[in-house]
Structures are given as structure tokens and as C-alpha cells.
Amino acid sequence: MWSHLNRLLFWSIFSSVTCRKAVLDCEAMKTNEFPSPCLDSKTKVVMKGQNVSMFCSHKNKSLQITYSLFRRKTHLGTQDGKGEPAIFNLSITEAHESGPYKCKAQVTSCSKYSRDFSFTIVDPVTSPVLNIMVIQTETDRHITLHCLSVNGSLPINYTFFENHVAISPAISKYDREPAEFNLTKKNPGEEEEYRCEAKNRLPNYATYSHPVTMPSTGGDSCPFCLKLLLPGLLLLLVVIILILAFWVLPKYKTRKAMRNNVPRDRGDTAMEVGIYANILEKQAKEESVPEVGSRPCVSTAQDEAKHSQELQYATPVFQEVAPREQEACDSYKSGYVYSELNF
């Protein structure tokens, strides 16, 4: 019985000493050999759906440390390591997955937490649109470039390029408005290609606009004459239509009305075109008197104003009569026969 009591007393004393030693060792490790771990990532700016890697490391390379990763109070994983950081691979798909994250390093009964780490979720920029305005002079070309990306988290940095060479510094825009860049160049002999780049805080992610090619002027020629010719022709056509509608047509209608109001005189018609029909001519013998039946004829005549007129004609009847006595005259010649004309 005494031996059993001695064993219990021995184990109680041993356990007490061990616990005190562990507490003393943990306190010593906390102050000297076991500082707080460090949680980091290669990038702090991500977009939704991006895979990321988080590194939890400790300055003490000689201890076997157990690393645990937490997002708020949710445990995400545990790894053991000695001298090397623990790597946790994650996928950021929702806004609440941006953080904060913490890493816990534990050795036996001693544990410490890292500082909070959070990601910044950024929407990527879409391909920008490049617009060019040109003012052409005899010797110079004044060019204004506008670049705008309609989607993407602000701020957005724009850079302009000419033939794949940057010609402007990064222009930051904190509002959804286009970046503008002006330049003046001598009339070139070759074609020039322009484009712009848009990027925000998302690293290693940039989009470019479609290239816009400016044709060469070829000396004093105008590269935009063809583009301006079509609007000019359309404007000229509109002007002609307006002139016809408001000036020529009313004038034509007035002249036509005046012509219709002029009185028509059939007797004084300058030109008369008639179509005659049913004219019968009969000749009798030399001894008999020719006699032709009277038949009315109808003709149609048109005056200058194109108005049709209906005219009636009759066939004359010839009768032989006795010759009358004529006074003698040197110039008179006999042998003529006169007839009466009856209608």
C-alpha cells in the first residue's frame, strides 16, 4: 500500500514539473524563438475566378511547425513544414472570398497567428475603342486620339502607340471618360498605324484596341478628300432638290396657268394642222360641165395651245356660164372660160 502511494506521489510531482517546464519553454519560445508567422501572396489584386497561392512562413527554420489557414473563422487547411513555407492554393470566385485570411503556426502547445491578409477583387478591362480626329493642313497633320474602355474597375491607365511604339505616358482616368492625346506631325510619306492600351490594377492583364491606319498624304494631296466627297455630294443634291421644290416648280406652274388663260382666236391661229378626208373629185367630159355632189367633210385642227377644233368643209360645184364681154386690151388674151362657184 505504501508503495502504491509513493508511485502516485511520484507521478504527481513529475507531471507538475513537466507542465511547469512546458509553460516556461512556451513562454521562452514566444518571446525569443517563436515569433508570429507571416502570411503573404504573390498578388493582392485578383479578379473573380482567379486561382491564387498563399504562403505561410516562419522565421524559425529548425522547428517542425504545423500551419493552419483560416478565412475569418473558417478553417481551410493544415500543413506541416520545417524550414519551408506552407503553400495553400485557393480559387477566388465570390466577393466574400477576398478575406480576411489568417495563418496559425503551432509547435506542441504553443501557437501564434499572423496578421490579416485580404485580396482586392478587380474587374478586368475590356478592349478599348480608339477614335481619331484629324485636321489636315498643307504641311502638317494635327491628330487627336481618344481611347475608352467601357468596362473594368477604375482607375484605368491608357497608353497610345504609333507603329507599336509608345508615344504617350500612361494617362490615368478615375472616371468613365476617354483619355485624350494630341500630336502634330508633318505630312508623312508612309502609312501610320495607331492603337491604345488599357489596364487597371490587375497585374499582367492589359487589352488593346483595334489598330487604326492613317493613309499617307503623298505630298500635298488630301487623304480625307474621299471621305468628305460623299457628304459634299449629298449636301449638293439636297440643295438642288430644295431649289426645284421652292423656286423652279412654282415658277413653272405660274407660267402654265398664264398660258391657259390666254384667249384663243380660231381665225388668227398661226399654225393650223388639218386632216382632211372624203374629198371626191370627178371630171366629166370636155363638152359637159363637171358636177360633183356636195359632201360635208369633217376635219380636226389643233391650235398652238394643243386644243382640238372641229371644222366642217364642203365640196364646191362648178357650172359653166357664157363668157362676158371684155374690153379690148393689149394684154388681154382670149380663150379663158369662167364658171360660177356655188356653195
UniProtKB/Swiss-Prot annotation:
Residues 249-343 are cytoplasmic. It is a single-pass type I membrane protein. Disulfide bonds join 56-103, 147-196. The chain crosses the membrane at residues 228-248. It comes from the Eukaryota. InterPro entries: Ig-like_dom_sf, Ig-like_fold, IL-40-like_Ig. SUPFAM superfamilies: Immunoglobulin. A motif (ITIM motif) lies at residues 311-316, 336-341. One of its GO terms (biological process) is mast cell degranulation. GO terms for cellular component: external side of plasma membrane; plasma membrane. Pfam families: Ig_2 (PF13895), Ig_C17orf99 (PF17736). Residues 1-19 form the signal peptide. Residues 35-118, 128-213 form the Ig-like C2-type domain. Expressed in myeloid cells (dendritic cells, macrophages and neutrophils, weak expression on B-cells but not in T-cells or natural killer cells), peripheral blood basophils and mast cells (at protein level). Keywords: Cell membrane, Disulfide bond, Glycoprotein, Immunoglobulin domain, Membrane, Phosphoprotein, Repeat, Signal, Transmembrane, Transmembrane helix. It is found in: Cell membrane. GO terms for molecular function: transmembrane signaling receptor activity. The modification Phosphotyrosine is found at residues 313, 338. Glycans are attached at residues 51, 60, 89, 151, 157, 182. Residues 20-227 are extracellular. N-glycosylated. Immunoglobulin-like receptor which plays an inhibitory role in degranulation of mast cells. Negatively regulates IgE-mediated mast cell activation and suppresses the type I immediate hypersensitivity reaction. Monomer. Interacts (tyrosine-phosphorylated) with PTPN6, PTPN11 and INPP5D. This is Allergin-1. The gene is MILR1.
